[in-house]
Amino acid sequence: MLYFLLYEQLHRYISPFRVFSYTTVRTAFASLTALFLCIALGPWLINKLREFQIGQYIREEGPKSHQKKAGTPTMGGVLIVISIVIPTLLWADLRYPYVWIALAGLLGYGWIGFLDDYAKVTKQRNLGLSGKRKLVYQFIMGFAFAASLLVMRAYGDFSTTMNIPFLKQFKPSLLMTSMMANPWTYVIGVAPFCIFVALVVVFYSNAVNLTDGLDGLAIGLMVIAAGALTVLAYAGGHAQLAQYLQLARNPRTSELTIFCGSMTGASLGFLWYNAHPAEIFMGDVGSLGLGGAMAVVAVLIKQEILLLFIGGIFVLEAFSVILQVGSYKLRHGKRIFKMAPLHHHFEALGWTESKIIARFWIAGLVLALFALTTLKLR
C-alpha cells in the first residue's frame, strides 16, 4: 500500500521517494514496522489474555520445573501474525502472487494453530485438536499450496526443478511430464511433486511447534531462520547476484524479501516478551503459522534442501520425537532420549533452561551461516 503511494504515485513529484523502488529499503522498513508493531501491541495483548484467562496448560508428563509456567498468557502468535501481515501489505508490491501465497501459508497454518489453542483453552487442558485431525488440516493446506504452484507453473511463473547444494548444474524435477500429457494419468504425474511439497510444509510447521517448549527458544531460532531466508530470497530475485551465485533467477521472489523481513522483525519483537522468563507464549497459532510460512517461502525460492540447515535445530527437535516414539513402539518401551523433544533431554541431564536456549541459538546461527556459505560453492 505504502509502496504504491510513496513510489508509484508520488516519486514523480518527490524525487527522494524513488528510494522505495529498492527492495532492500522496503525490507528494512518492513522489518522495523513489524518489530515496533509487535513491541507496541505486546502489553495490550498480554493484559487482554490475562483478562480473559487464556493461559498455558502444562502437560503432566513434562519436566516438573515447567509447572510454574502454568497460566502464562498464550496464543501470542496472533500478535506475530498481525505484525507480519500488516508490514507486508504496507511495503510489498502486491502485484506479485508469491507474496499472497506466503501470506496464505502463514494465515492458513496459523488458523489451524488457533483452532488447536482454542480447543485447549475451552477444554482447560493441554490437549487440543487430535493429532490425526490436525494432520488432516495441515495436509489439506499443503496440497492446496502444491496445487497453486502447479497453476503458476502452467502460466510460466514457477519452476518445479530443485536446487541441490554443491551440484548447481543438477536440477531434478519431481514432475513426471510424460504422464502429465495424458489427462488420465495427470494425477500420477504430479503426485510426487504434490506429496513432496505437502510433506515439507507439514514437517516444518510441526517441527517449529515441537521446538516451542522453552522460553524464547523457537522464536529466537525463527529470527535466525527468517533472516537467512531474507538473504536467499533477495539473492534469488537479484539479476547480478543470481548470475554470480549460479542461482535460478526468478524476479518474482524479490518481493518475498519483504515478507521474510517482516517475519524477522515480528519474531524479534515477540522475543522481547517471550525471552526467559516469558511473559507470553506464542501457542500453536504462532508456531504452526511460522513453521508453515518458513517452509512455503523455502519452496517458492527453491531452497528446500538448504532449509534442512537453516532450520537445522527444528529438524533435530522433530527427529528426536520421531526416533523416541519409534524406539518406544519397536523396542518394547525402550527410549533413546531421557525425554523428547531434544531440549527436554538436556533439561533432564541437568542443563539450565537459559543455557539450553543460548546454546541452541548458537548452533542454529552456525547452521544458518553454513547454509549461506554453500551459495558460493559449486
Curated annotation (Swiss-Prot):
The family this protein is said to belong to: Belongs to the glycosyltransferase 4 family. MraY subfamily.
GO cellular component, one term: plasma membrane
Pathway(s) served: Cell wall biogenesis; peptidoglycan biosynthesis
MF (Gene Ontology): metal ion binding; phospho-N-acetylmuramoyl-pentapeptide-transferase activity; UDP-N-acetylmuramoyl-L-alanyl-D-glutamyl-meso-2,6-diaminopimelyl-D-alanyl-D-alanine:undecaprenyl-phosphate transferase activity
InterPro entries, per database record: Glycosyl_transferase_4, PNAcMuramoyl-5peptid_Trfase, PNAcMuramoyl-5peptid_Trfase_CS
Main location: membrane
Enzyme Commission (EC) number: 2.7.8.13
Subcellular location: Cell inner membrane
Catalyzed reaction equations: UDP-N-acetyl-alpha-D-muramoyl-L-alanyl-gamma-D-glutamyl-meso-2,6-diaminopimeloyl-D-alanyl-D-alanine + di-trans,octa-cis-undecaprenyl phosphate = di-trans,octa-cis-undecaprenyl diphospho-N-acetyl-alpha-D-muramoyl-L-alanyl-D-glutamyl-meso-2,6-diaminopimeloyl-D-alanyl-D-alanine + UMP
Keywords: Cell cycle, Cell division, Cell inner membrane, Cell membrane, Cell shape, Cell wall biogenesis/degradation, Magnesium, Membrane, Metal-binding, Peptidoglycan synthesis, Transferase, Transmembrane, Transmembrane helix
TM segment ranges: 27-47, 74-94, 96-116, 135-155, 184-204, 216-236, 256-276, 280-300, 305-325, 355-375
Pfam families in alphabetical order: Glycos_transf_4, MraY_sig1
HAMAP family: MraY (MF_00038)
UniProt keyword Cell membrane present: yes
Name of this protein: Phospho-N-acetylmuramoyl-pentapeptide-transferase
Cofactor (UniProt): Mg(2+)
Membrane topology (UniProt): Multi-pass membrane protein
Biological role: Catalyzes the initial step of the lipid cycle reactions in the biosynthesis of the cell wall peptidoglycan: transfers peptidoglycan precursor phospho-MurNAc-pentapeptide from UDP-MurNAc-pentapeptide onto the lipid carrier undecaprenyl phosphate, yielding undecaprenyl-pyrophosphoryl-MurNAc-pentapeptide, known as lipid I.
